[in-house]
């Protein structure tokens, strides 16, 4: 059985129908979310309920097949690959965003498949209907619910220069020429390359320019030379990657004179996630925001310490 190709109708339907169902349901969530004023994002229903339903549906089609453990994993992995491709082509999701969500999708597809195998072996129609009905109710309730998760990330660096020399490089800096180290940046996630300003005062406009050409519009809300630069995010492009599911709210750079010719710079970002479960996506969001800080502050350190 291990080396047999996928040939039977039931095998093929186990791939086709779950993915048609998934794309249809997710498209509906996008439609309903717009009507209730939600930003675009991945919700609990999309990354947990839909994959579980996919697994259950596949289990029904494959219920009379004696699949080995390896083939079971392969089939469900293939289902996730098909779903990922459809998400990119039909829903316009970015490749890195799909990469981030894929482990979670595979996990819940496998859980759904295990639930389906148990249900259909028992042939308990009433119980089967109750489980699917419960998942449907949760799906609808989650789709119509508000989804927001706010967090803040702060990072520090010590620069061998006084605040007065560093300040101008904090407010605006020339293009970063060094290639990024962070692996997500290296495979295509937009990374910061430069910052420009329209003036050196409160209320001035500031732009953080990314490698893809996108620019985040900012307005300086606090301008204390050598001490505090705080800015509000006023415009953010809807990039198909992570930026489509994360709103940057505010940024800040605090400079502390250490009294020995060095300065401690603290970079802070406030952001809001529109993807759930938040605990999973925030692990990625924190890492991405932190690496944005590191890339920018390392550049500030390099040009500030240059003689």
Model segments located where?
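A conserved amphipathic terminal alpha-helix motif
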Residues: 102-128, 271-307
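A short, structured loop/turn motif at beta-sheet edges
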Residues: 159-164, 221-228, 254-264, 301-307
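Membrane-water interface at transmembrane helix exits
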Residues: 29-34, 58-66, 87, 91, ...
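Short capping loops/turns at secondary-structure boundaries
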Residues: 97-104, 148
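Aromatic-acidic/polar surface patches that form glycan- and anion
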Residues: 159, 209, 289, 293
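Glycine-rich portal/gate segments that line the openings of hydrophobic small-molecule binding cavities
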Residues: 4-14, 26, 30-75, 105-106, ...
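Beta-strand/loop substructures that line and gate deep hydrophobic ligand-binding cavities in soluble
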Residues: 69-78, 82-88, 93-100, 238-290, ...
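Hydrophobic ligand-binding cavity/cleft-lining segments
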Residues: 2-44, 48-56, 76-82, 86, ...
